[in-house]
Amino acid sequence: MKYQVTVLGAGLAGCEAALWLAGKGVQVELYEQKPTHFSPAHKSEGFAELICSNSLKAERLDSASGLLKEEMRRMGSQLLNAAEVARVAAGGALAVDRDAFSAEVTRLVEACPNITVHRERVERIDESAPILVATGPLTDGALADEIGKLTGDERLHFYDAVAPIVTAESLDHEKVFAASRYDRGEADYLNCPFNKAEYEAFHAALASAERAPLHDFDTGAEQSARPDPDAHGKKADTVTVYEGCMPIELMAARGADTMRFGPLRPVGLVDPRTGHRPWANVQLRAENKDRTLYNIVGFQTNLKWGEQKRVFSMIPGLEHAEFVRYGVMHRNTFLDAPRVLEGSLCLKEHPNVFFAGQITGFEGYMESAASGLLVARNLYARLEGKVLPPPPVDTMCGALIQYLTTENKHFQPMGANMGILPPLPEESRPRDKRLRYMAAAQRAVASFQQWLDENAL
């Protein structure tokens, strides 16, 4: 064999990377801790185990997930082939029998002559040769400590809840206004002003909204605050949470004005429609450089997704908001990617150590698999003495890489969505959203293929 590479983790990213590298003649040493050690979330011994949903999302090219899949196909994804074998009917989405999918991926990996599987737990990273770490968001123990040392952190970045993200174009800009408090500095935030009646209706809906049950493995996360006193018998409230990540619905349950003196405080703001300070105010913070995506500030939540859509659409200006990511509450670990990763997804200070999958901040099944393909290409190029440029930013893979590696003080994981793609030129930008998404997808496919052709391996 010409080269040998170690891959840690046989999840979606690790398997996709191992299969691609093996196809290039690389001898892959693939380490998987199951069945000698299971995370609290994993149950089966198979590879590429899908923990939650069995949906791999939409297939239409004019959808973010469909575009990502097309880029993956052009890179030679074998997990998409496995998904076809395990496909179940799901309308316009690609859904799989999760056991059949895992079995097919496991079969592909174990049948590959260039992959040697080691069923054992790894606690140290040997950076004397290129190594790919794809151990997932539940990486723990000595390996998590090892990664923390390499990245300069005592531990990885833990969080318990994240807020939803909406697209800028779906906001009602007749109601939403740009301003900073007391007009200090740049108007970096968009503001959604409530009058008293609107706020009271919103508070009532939020306080009574249905919350999602936490998985058992989520309740074991490292947490540092007291149990919430307003439990109301709901499982989601019986766990402790970081005070700085308090779900907005728990804050609402503490009293009618709690949010108004917290993230919804209106001080220092004037609603240009009325000339007065709002009764309450929700702020939106840009999530990317192009300001096509906005985070609902302070709205970490554990509401069910349908409830988030219903209740958060009561915020003035968000009546028709398009949610590209709903808020979630669970345990997770991920790298501070903008600080520690190069565009090739190797560590800046330890260039032989590559990362792929959800531990990097790629959010989603297919996103994890796509990152495995991208990193495999970068790692192989390194072995060949080459340096690959990242995919263009007008592709889904390129936009995700740019998001992960661009400085961001509020960095959170991100999945594929059309909002992270740069806008189309105004003169050729269709008004119809579906046509606009198709035009962006066609541009992305052409750009991605050109990148592949110019960087053939």
Residue ranges and their predicted role:
Residues 2-13:
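Beta1/beta-strand and adjacent pyrophosphate-binding region of the FAD-binding site
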Residues 19-81, 393-404:
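N-terminal FAD cofactor-binding segment of flavoenzymes
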Residues 49-59, 84-100:
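Dinucleotide-binding Rossmann-like beta1-alpha1 core, especially the glycine-rich loop
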Residues 98-117:
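Helical element adjacent to the flavin cofactor pocket in flavoenzyme catalytic cores
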Residues 111-285, 290, 294-305, 309-310:
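Predominantly flavin-linked oxidoreductase catalytic cores and closely associated redox partners
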Residues 296-362, 369-370, 389-406, 411-417, ...:
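A glycine-rich dinucleotide-binding beta-alpha-beta segment and adjacent secondary-structure elements
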Residues 368-390:
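Internal hydrophobic alpha-helix adjacent to the cofactor/substrate pocket in enzyme cavities
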Residues 414-457:
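C-terminal auxiliary extensions adjacent to catalytic cores
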